[in-house]
């Protein structure tokens, strides 16, 4: 997990993965 702070919510985690997947 890079580019993200140590503390984040599961929603941010999912949103980040979805965004990365869509913009891969």
Swiss-Prot record:
InterPro entries from the UniProt entry: Leader_Arg2_CPA1
Keywords noted in UniProt: Leader peptide
GO biological process: one example: translational attenuation
SS bonds (residue pairs): none
Superkingdom in the source lineage: Eukaryota
Pfam family, one: Leader_CPA1
Effect of residue 12 to N: Eliminates arginine-specific stalling of ribosomes at the termination codon
Role of this protein: Arginine attenuator peptide (AAP) that has a regulatory role in the production of arginine-specific carbamoyl phosphate synthetase. Encoded by an upstream open reading frame (uORF) within the 5'-leader region of arginine-specific carbamoyl phosphate synthetase small chain (arg-2) mRNA, it attenuates the translation of the downstream arg-2 ORF. In the presence of high concentrations of arginine, ribosomes translating the uORF encoding AAP stall at the termination codon, resulting in reduced translation from the downstream arg-2 initiation codon.
Family: Belongs to the arginine attenuator peptide family.
Name of the featured protein: Arginine attenuator peptide
Species whose genome carries this gene: Neurospora crassa (strain ATCC 24698 / 74-OR23-1A / CBS 708.71 / DSM 1257 / FGSC 987)
């Amino acid at each position: 997990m890079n580019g993200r702070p140590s503390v984040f919510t599961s929603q941010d985690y999912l949103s980040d993965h979805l965004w990365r997947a869509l913009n891969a």
